[in-house]
Structures are given as structure tokens and as C-alpha cells.
Amino acid sequence: MTEDKAEKVMPEETAFEEIEKDFQEVLSELSGDKSLEKFRTEYEKLHSIMKKSYENEKRLMAKCRELNAEIVVNSAKVATALKLSQDDQTTIASLKKEIEKAWKMVDSAYDKEQKAKETILALKEEIVNLTKLVEQGSGLSMDQDSNIRDLLKFKEEVTKERDQLLSEVVKLRENLAQTIEKQQAAEHAKEEAEMAISQFQQEIQHRQNEASRESRKKEKLEKELRQIQTDMDGRQAEIKAMQQYMHKSKEELQRLEQQLKEQKILNERAAKEVEQFQMRNAKLQQENDQHTLTCEQLSQENQQKALELKAKEDEIHQMRLDLGKLNKIREQIHKKLHQLDDQKAEVEQQKDTLKNQILGLEREVESSKKQAELDKKAMEELLRERDILNKNMLKAVSATQKQVDLVKLHEQAKKNLEEEIQNYKDEAQKQRKIIFQLEKERDRYINEASDLTQRVLANMEDIKVREIQIFDYRKKIAESETKLKQQQNLYEAVRSDRNLYSKNLVEAQDEITEMKRKLKIMTHQVDQLKEEISAKEAALVKLHLEQQRIEKEKETLKAELQKLRQQALETKHFIEKQEVEERKLLRIIAEADGERVRQKKELDQVISERDILGSQLVRRNDELALLYEKIKIQQSVLNKGETQYNQRVEDMRILKLEIKKLRREKGILARSVANVEELRQELYHMQREFLKERTRCRALEEELENPMNVHRWRKLEASDPSTFELIQKIHTLQKRLISKTEEVVEKELLLQEKEKLYVELKHILARQPGPEAAEQLQIYRHTLREKTKQLKVLSSELNMYESQSQEYKYEIERLGNELMSLKKKYLAQKRKELVLKNKDRMSMNNIFSETKKSVPRFTGGGFPLHQATKVKF
């Protein structure tokens, strides 16, 4: 692995050195030219930034390697923790099942106990009533004696049932205590495992965050480096373009200089020709004194020609100066144009980037606005629904709070546990994925290590050293089975050994390279070494596999030992909790025994009082017989009134519930229902009925409190309801009860739906953007305003530069046109001069020929040849 890293680092360093060389070459090229001084400084800045980014990249790579090593260590710890958490979850599930069974048994026992208590209370009330009657003074009838005996028997049976139920409750409580202790022990173990997992997760998260930060820094630096390289490439391209332009301008200057030289040569030739003409004129003047007039004319013409030549030379000189000025102006214009082009390109780039940024920001702003509007609408709708739901929830909860509290608690605990289990499953799935990736990396690294070992096997001495180290390793593994506490130190030792092995591998590679150089000398030893190496390689592979197997066994033993320790701790906590629960149960049993003794005393007291009352009742039997009949009649009347009163109270309660229901339905359906008036009328009728029932109840209460029967001594007549009426009433009550149970089920379903809606509302509200999003939006708006201002400034500058460039273009075109017109004038002048020269030559030739013809020629004795000799005879 280290060799691969070294091989990766080497080409990067070589590439960096090549870039450094290129930079130095470019600097040496740019240092001679002063016009590119700014570019050279920019280039140096880019190079310094690239150097810094390269150094930061090196540092980040080293940090990434360290973080990867720590992640591997933490992943192993997480794997062990996940195994423990999975075992804990199975135990928790089994304990939950046992607890649910125990709770069911406890609930049934509690119901039985409540029924028994109710019967005891009813009996006590009857006893109190009887004692009151006895105190009023009269004897009991036979029916009453039989009733009392039946009641006493029933009480004894009830007490027996209560004792049985108490014993069952004690047993169930013991079972419950055991299961609770088991559950608490499992929960304690689960909490410890969760703590360990959370610690490992925090460490892994911390490491991952650091790695992600470093990777982001690295990516940022790589982007900057790429940007710098692209800038450098662009600057180099600009330099090349400038050099090409300079080369072209030099060629243009050389061409113009060549033209000037040719022009000079032509002027010199013309001057020489003028001198020749002057010489000829002088000779002609010397030879032709007779033709002075013609010579004077010719001299005048020559003087005129000389003046014209001087004027032409002055014009040529002026044209040369103008050309020099024009060249300078052209160079300045070219420089300005290049500067403007560069500035324009930079401005266009900035403009494009700013446009892209503005477009991106506008899109983000639009999307955020749309999202904000949608969120606002959703929030308003959800707030409305939440208000409605809150109202409904408050109304529903006020009606069924006592019955639902326990169910809610149990369901909440169940949901929390299920959510925790689901979270643990998700986290375990994530950790499994991470472990799977890490195992892949580990396998890759193992393959790389095996490849490296195969390379290293060429050296015999290193193999012997490794065999010794493997032997030591085995000893260490054997010791680790007895001393599992020192596993971490051994692990660190193995890591250091691995690092040593990697160093040894590097050294062995160096030695291999040296041995390769000596291969030409040691060819006869190579075959023997190859055979020995193959044997040693096979042995080393076996040893490597054996080592892997031993490491796996070591890890399993470590996990088992950790598991056993945790189980021991769990059992210890379980025993402690059992003892605490046992103490609680003993205290409860003692309280129950005290209650039983107290009730027994009360029963004995009641029996003694009964005996006393029996003796008193025998004496007062006659008086009580008369009173009993009256009491019976009054009691039946009272019972009827009480039943009617209870019915009215129940009707009132039902009506109240119905009113609440109607109000709730009215609140929910107020927007969609059109027949509001009908509902109001119904509500009004219901209220009237309710008021009627209330007045009726009040009248009944007043009648009970202030009976209208003045003559107490008269016998009251009454008739018990028939069995058919009672059966009908029972049927109606059963129907009512069924309907009420159905309503309760519907209410529970509604409550569940409302709870679901409430949870969804909570989640939606949690997902809604908070004040931070508004602050970010404000920041984005502020930045958008600044960017728009900058864009306006840049656009105005761009327009100014464009107008300047247009002016410069027009100036260049004008100068080019002037230059072309000057060239045309110059060529026309040259042509005129050539034509005049040709004419002068022709005229001179004609003059010479005419002078030669007109002058007399003498030959021999000096007689003229063209005159005829007149001879006289």
C-alpha cells in the first residue's frame, strides 16, 4: 500500500517539477519584455497560489490516510457493538412478550379484585342500613333473618374468593416482578450497548465529518489548482498571441524599411541621373558656345527640375516623418486595442459569470418565493386543521381522558420502543453497509499486501526474519487467549509490525532493484533461488491464512467474552432489581395482611353487634314489623325515584354528550353544510328538551327532599313492575349499551385518526422552514441587490469601453484610408516623375541630334561636305 502511495506521489511530484520548470522558462522569457511586467506578476501570483494548494493537498492527503485508519479501527468496534445490540434486541422482545402476558393476568386479577371490593362495599352498606333499622328499634322478620344469613354466607364466600384472588395477585406480582427485573436487566444491557454504539457512532460521525471537510477542502483546492492551470494556459496562449503579433509587427516594419530603402535607392539613382545631366549640360555649354540661348533655356529648365527634385525630396522626407508618426500612432493604437480587448474579454467573462450568478440567484429566489408561498398556504391550512383538531381533541379528551390515559401511555411506550428498534435497525443497516465497504477495502488492502509479499519473497534473509516474526506472532496470539484485556495493546503492536513490514517491503524493493542489477553476474544462482522462493512463498501463504484464521478466532473469543461479561452484569442488575421488587412485594403483602386483619376485626365486631342487635330485634319485633312495611313501601318509592333520577341523570349525560357531539360536528361541518337553520332549530329543540328534563329532574329532587304526602300514617300503595316490563327494559338497556360501546369504538377510531393527523402535523411543522430560512432569503436579496448594482456599473463601463473601441476603430480606418491615399499620391507622383524623365531624355536626344545636323562638318583640308562646290568654266 505504501509502495502504491509512493508510486502515486512520484508522478505528482514529477508533474509539479515539470510545471515549475515551465514556470521558470516562461518567467525568463517574460523578464526581458517590460510591456509584459503586469502579466509576469500575475503569473507569479498564480504560481504561488498553485504551490500553496499543492502543499495543502499533500497535508490533506496525509490527514485522509490517518482518518481512514481510524475509521477502520472504529468500524471494528461498531461491528462488535452491533452484534451485542442484536442479541439485546432478541432478549428485549422475549421479555416484552412475557411482560404483556403478566400484565394481562394482572388486569384480570385486578378486575376480579375490583368486583370483590364492590360486593364487599355493597354488603357493608346493607349492614349499615340494617344497623340503622335495628337502632330505630323493632324485631326482624323471618325473611330478614334468612336474608342476613344469606348475606353472611355470601360474605364468607366473597372473603374466600378475595383470599384466593389475593394469593393469585401475589403470585402474579411475583411473576411480574421477575419479568420486570428481566426486562430492566435487558434494558440496562441495551442502554449500555446503545451508549457504546452512540459513542462509536459519534466518533465515526466526527471522523466522517473531518474526512468530508478535508475532502471538501481538497476538492476546493483542486478546483483552484485547475482554475489556476486554466488561467496559466490562457495567459500562455495570450503570451503566444502577443509574441505572434510582435513577430508580425516586426515583419511589417522590416517590409516598410525595405520599401524605404528601395525608395532611397531610387532617389539616389535620380540624383545621380541629375548630376549626369548637369555634367552633360556643362560639357554642352563648353562645346556649344554658339547655342548659349538654347543652353540657357536648358539650364533654366534644369534649375526648374532641380527645384522640383528638391521639393520632391522634401515631400519624401515629410512623408517619411509622417510614416514614422503613423507607425508610432499605429503601435500605440494596437497596444490600446490589445489592452481594450483584454479588458473587454475580462469584462465579458465577469459579465457572463455575473449573469450566470444572477440567473441562478433569480431562480433560487423564485423557487424560494414559490416554496415560501406554498409553505405559507400549507401552513395556513395546517394551522386551520390544527385548530379544528385541537378543539376536537380537547373535547374528545375531556370526555375520555380517564379511560385513554393508560392506553396512551402504553401505546406511547410501545411506539417509542418500536421507533427505537427501527432506528437501531436503520443504524445497523447503515453500519452494515459501512462495514461491507470497509471489508471490501480490507480485502483490497489484503490483496495488495499479498502482492507486495510476493514481490518481497525474493530476499531470503527477509523471509527468515518474517518466519521469526510469525512465530512471535503466534506466541502473542496464544497469550492473548489468556489475557484478553491486553488485546488493544496487541492490536497496536500488530499495527506497528504492519508498518514495520511495509518499511521492510520498501527496503526489500530497494534490495530487489540492486539484485536485478546484479542479475547478469548471478545468473547461475537465480534458478536455485527461484525454487527456494516458490517453496517459501507457499509456506508464507499458508502462514498468512493461518494467521487470518487465528485472528478471526481471537475476535470471536473476544466477542463471546464481552457477551459473557455483559450477561453477568445483566444478571447482577436483574438480581438487584428482583430483590428490590421482592421487598416492595413483601411490604405490599404486609399491608394486605394488615388490611385483612382489620377487616376480620371489623367482621367480628359486626357479628358481635349482630348478636346484640338480634337480642334487641327480638324485643322490638312487633314494632319493627309495622315499621318495616312502611319502610318497604317508602323504600320502593325511593328506589323508583332513584332509578328514575339515575335515568334522568344518565339521559342528561347522554344529552350533554350528544350536545357536545353536535357542537363538534357543527364546528367541523360549518363551512360545508348549507342547512344551518335546520341544525339551529334542532339544537334549539334539543336545548328545550334538555331544559324540560332538567326541570323535571329538579322537580323530582324537590319532591324527594320535600315529600307531598302529609298524612304519614296512611298506607302507601305501590306495585312492582312486571317481569315483561323488566325484560323490555333490560333489552332496551342492552341495546343502549351496545350502541354506546359502538360509539366508544368509533370515538377511539376517531381519536386514533386525530392522533395520526396530529403526528403528521408535527412532522410537517418540523419540516417547515424557520426564521433561519427567512434570514438566508434576506441575505440573498441583499447580495442580489449588490450584484445588480455591480452589474449596472459593469454594463455602463462596458458600454463606455465599447464606444471607445468604436472610436478607435473609426480612427484606425481613417488613418488607414489616409495612408492608402498617401500611397496612391506617392505612386502617382512617381509615375509623373518617370514620365517627365522620359520626356526630358527624349527632348535632349532630339536637341543633340538637331545640333549635330546644323553644325558644319569638316574633313581633310577643311572643306565643308554638305555645301555644293560651284565650278566655273
UniProtKB/Swiss-Prot annotation:
The gene is Cfap58. Transmembrane segments: none annotated. Interacts with ODFP2. Pfam families: CFAP58_CC. It is found in: Cell projection, Cilium; Cell projection, Cilium, Flagellum; Cytoplasm, Cytoskeleton, Microtubule organizing center, Centrosome. Residues 204-221 have a biased composition (Basic and acidic residues). Disruption phenotype: Male mice are infertile with severely decreased sperm motility and abnormal sperm flagellar morphology. It comes from the Eukaryota. One of its GO terms (biological process) is sperm mitochondrial sheath assembly. GO terms for cellular component: centrosome; cytoplasm; sperm flagellum; sperm midpiece. This is Cilia- and flagella-associated protein 58. InterPro entries: CFAP58_CC.
